[in-house]
Amino acid sequence: MYIKSVENLYKKYNGKTLADDIYAVSREYNNFQNAFNRMAKDIAANINAEVVKTLKGHYYGSMFFKRGNRYVYVHYGNSINRTHIDFGNNTWSSFIYCRTAKSDSDYTGGTNNFVTLNELADKIDKLLG
């Protein structure tokens, strides 16, 4: 499905390596995290769901989507090079993965689904049933 904010985030950040302030999240990466969270809210609105919890970690982030009584956990971040953004990879080293969850505190739920940014909305929608 097409969502303008997904396209905008992709164009702005894909392939970029953001500033790394080592001991603290850089302002540039924090701006990226904020943009990712805004995009997630747009995805939720497009699939009749809501973002019920977000976490901004040290060069990674996560969130929970909810529709009815079903939850999906989404994690983003690069485990190999923490400040490099690669939205096009959907393998085990993917920047984004999602899975079913039992609640908005279930960080170990179902099987990881590695997705590209462009696949994310459809995968969340499918996992929410």
Predicted features, each with a name:
Residues 6-9, 120, 124:
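Generic structural signal of hydrophobic/aromatic residues within well-ordered alpha-helices
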Residues 1-2, 126-129:
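Short intrinsically disordered terminal tails
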Residues 2-69, 104:
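Negatively charged, low-complexity tracts enriched in Asp/Glu with abundant Ser/Thr
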Residues 55-122:
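Intrinsically disordered, low-complexity regulatory segments enriched in Ser/Thr/Pro
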